[in-house]
């Protein structure tokens, strides 16, 4: 990458968006320097902001520095957690799982349908691949529309984006390990399928296992209705 590449990203003068820079989070040694949680509200049928704030509130409770960026489209957001040294993608994603699970348990009224994925999206680099690409913030064309910028918890953009970035706090690996010990949860999968997957492929359906169902259920019939 050259200076002009970053300048063009920030300037955003290409009408086709060909100057946008993205980043593959996972290094060759399967480590990363950040966890980015993507909340995407393409349909605009539900409020992604409440989902984002629930995630951020857990971060605040756990003393995890977290920063909100409004997406380039304006219909979603990224929640960024930065690490002061590279950590394994496995650990980073495990932290994201724990935060998201806690956020869900704190407010049962939230559907979290806007949750899309984590970046990195894998624990390890796929063989022969680079992982998933995340667009960097502060893209010029989107910024002129008030998007691709860091915002406060009222979703108002910070007046000075560079000053805000100069004051971010990063999570240490020692702090990360302690959080994982205190808040261990099972692995959480994707809650949302988007057009960015492979829409031309038939999704793989896992067969249901007998242990997924109770051995007995009680069925009550009344007024020609069935109640469980």
Annotate each PLM feature:
Residues 1-75, 82-94, 98, 105:
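Signature for HUH/AEP ssDNA processing cores
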Residues 31, 37, 61, 85-88, ...:
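Residue-identity detector for threonine
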Residues 50, 101, 138-140:
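Generic detector of bulky aromatic hydrophobic side chains
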Residues 78-80, 146-147:
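Short, solvent-exposed polar/charged micro-motifs at secondary-structure junctions
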Residues 106-228:
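C-terminal accessory nucleic-acid interaction domains of nucleic acid-metabolism proteins
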């Amino acid at each position: 990458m050259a200076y002009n590449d970053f300048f063009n990203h920030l300037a955003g003068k290409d009408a086709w968006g060909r100057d946008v820079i993205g980043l593959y989070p996972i290094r060759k040694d399967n480590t990363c320097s950040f966890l980015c949680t993507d909340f995407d509200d393409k349909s605009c049928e539900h409020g992604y902001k409440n989902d984002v704030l629930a995630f951020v509130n857990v971060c605040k409770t756990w003393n995890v520095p977290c920063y909100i960026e409004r997406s380039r489209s304006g219909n979603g957001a990224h929640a960024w957690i930065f690490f002061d040294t590279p950590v394994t993608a496995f650990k980073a994603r495990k932290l994201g799982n724990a935060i998201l699970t806690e956020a869900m348990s704190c407010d049962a009224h939230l559907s979290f349908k806007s949750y899309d994925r984590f970046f990195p999206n894998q624990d390890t680099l796929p063989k022969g691949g680079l992982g998933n690409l995340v667009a960097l913030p502060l893209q010029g064309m989107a910024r002129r529309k008030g998007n691709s910028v860091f915002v406060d918890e009222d979703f108002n953009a910070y007046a000075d984006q560079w000053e805000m970035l100069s004051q971010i706090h990063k999570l240490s690996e020692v702090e990360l390990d302690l959080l994982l010990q205190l808040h261990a949860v099972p692995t959480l999968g994707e809650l949302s399928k988007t057009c960015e997957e492979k829409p031309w492929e038939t999704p793989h359906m896992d067969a249901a296992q007998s242990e997924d169902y109770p051995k007995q259920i009680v069925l009550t019939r009344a007024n020609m209705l069935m109640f469980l």
